[in-house]
Amino acid sequence: MNRKKKWFSLLPMVLMLVFVLSFPAGAADWPDTIVDGHLHYLDFLQQSDGFFKLTRKMDECGVDSAVIFGMAMAKQWDENTETAPTYYLSNDSRCYYYSGTDHLLLQALRKQPESIKKRFYPFICGINPNDRYAASQLRNLLEMYPGEIYGIGEIMSRHDDLTALTYGEPPHADHPAFLEIFDLAAEYDIPVLIHHNISGVNIEDPIYLKEMQNALAHNRDADIIWAHVGISRRITVPTLLQVADKMLKENSNLYYDISWIVFEDYINKDEKSLKDWAKLIEKYPDRFILGTDKVGHWDTYPQEVTKYTPLIKLLSDDTAAKLTGGNMLRLIGVQENAAVKPVKKAS
């Protein structure tokens, strides 16, 4: 057999290998459509590995598309610090709200070929949530980039160390500026993704829950996605599962994003926790969203997808399909395999 014939005889095996490697581990348990519902294109230095590398990593683990946004804060490099910070926790220099992040994202996406561009649904986030002008600034962006923006977020409310390092007063979800953002989102029929710690560091009672309850009650037409089920580093609320159940029952406009450490620290903490959270997701199948929460760099992107496989295995096919893409696509007004742009509600 000559080399050419030998190559063609191996081609089916090669194609099969490529097909298998393009899906998450345990792919037989995963739905056909996977949407990353929480992804930062930029890090705290407003830098990124770029779209080309990102899409290659998405292909490695079978992710079809992603909701993507910049980073609302930037880390300051102080004059008396010789080593440049690479993360907001690199040192004790301050952070500040950075409005350029949305333009960096949207302009970078505009430059991509259609094959890449069509896989991303941009959100906007570059505002100071304590500023009563914030909603007006977001409206300007919605008008500046018509048909290109699918939501608002990730907007930072209470966020432990990040809140402490950021210039200005601590934000909270029921601040008047936040309430006006929710009104804007309802007007445009787009969701808001918000990071709001449910409690303080090492405080077991959910002391900041009331602020989110007020936010949700302010405008029931505003769909609010609560990032990480309100959890961050060193946030230890033993009753989180029960609180989440009650909140979903009482607030029809609430959705939970299970990205980042809430999955490791709570949902997949042990076998019992995983089963209990799977039951809650089955109870409210339309209200949970999967995401990676990667921040500008993609080397470990596939692992942040495949970590959900144990949970996916416990869910019904219909619920799994909603968690891994259906719920987010519905919230942003997109049907699977379609490019429907969000439209402003008639006034």
Task: Show the residue positions of the predicted features.
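Active-site gating/metal-coordination segments in enzymes
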Residues: 82-199
